[in-house]
């Protein structure tokens, strides 16, 4: 989870270079799940899916997780036991993910606010991400994202693993080892050679992840 242009594609490419992990890119199932819950809410402009989620018992919440696993099965192409859902905007739904998928590993990809916001602003996204069309809007959005993730850090301590892009660039192996340890995976040298992985990548960073990590993007703002 995180904002666009924050290093999430790099993280996915590193993890997808592990023998136990399949990269399945950005999946729509969590957002579809929230829309389904929202349709069950009482009519009104202020109704949210959170209102419905709060009324569900343990069995109903477990069923949501099972539904997610079943619906994402079509995206699986390899027998790897783990897969990645790289939808950045799922940071809004960390609470739902925590409840419905208690065994999921939640990774927050974070980048320096000026670097992230400027990169978002100058990137023409294929669709969505309307908040990136104004520097003021993207700045407010970044601040809201940081505040929400701080809330989850407080109420769910240790549940979310944060990968700071700048630290990944400065000390790649140490950060990769921390990431794999959080995921319960042994270190594999292939994760350090992620740029040799020829899996399809369909984000704005598709060219960068075909190269070794470089420092050029650290302070370009």
Where is each model-derived feature located?
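PAPS-dependent sulfotransferases, especially Golgi type II membrane carbohydrate sulfotransferases
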Residues: 45-80, 120-162, 170-221
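Generic structural signal for helix capping and beta-alpha/helix-loop junctions
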Residues: 31-33, 116, 197
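Glycine-rich loop motifs involved in handling phospho/adenylate chemistry
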Residues: 3, 85, 167, 194-198
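PAPS/PAP-binding and catalytic site of the sulfotransferase fold
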Residues: 7-22, 93-102, 109-112, 162-189, ...
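Phosphate-binding active sites in nucleotide-utilizing proteins
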Residues: 1-101, 105, 109-110
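Conserved P-loop NTPase nucleotide-binding/switch module
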Residues: 97-101, 107-128, 132
């Amino acid at each position: 989870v995180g904002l666009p242009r924050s290093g999430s594609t790099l993280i996915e490419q590193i993890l997808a270079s592990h023998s136990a992990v399949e990269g399945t890119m950005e999946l729509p199932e969590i957002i579809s799940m929230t829309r389904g819950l929202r349709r069950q809410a009482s009519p009104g402009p202020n109704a949210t899916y959170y209102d419905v989620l709060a009324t569900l018992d343990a069995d109903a919440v477990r069923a949501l997780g099972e539904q997610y696993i079943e619906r994402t099965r079509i995206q699986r192409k390899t027998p790897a036991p783990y897969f990645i859902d790289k939808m950045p905007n799922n940071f809004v739904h960390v609470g739902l993910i925590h409840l419905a998928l208690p065994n999921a590993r939640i990774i927050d990809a974070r980048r320096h606010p000026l670097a992230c916001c400027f990169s978002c602003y100058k990137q023409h996204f294929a669709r969505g991400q309307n908040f990136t069309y104004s520097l003021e809007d993207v700045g407010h959005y970044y601040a809201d994202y940081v505040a929400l993730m701080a809330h989850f850090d407080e109420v769910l301590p240790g549940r979310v693993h944060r990968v700071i892009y700048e630290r990944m660039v400065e000390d790649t192996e140490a950060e990769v080892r921390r990431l794999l340890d959080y995921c319960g995976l042994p270190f594999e040298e292939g994760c350090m050679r992620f740029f040799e992985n020829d899996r399809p990548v369909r984000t704005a960073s598709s060219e960068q992840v075909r190269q070794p990590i470089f420092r050029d993007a650290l302070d370009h703002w």
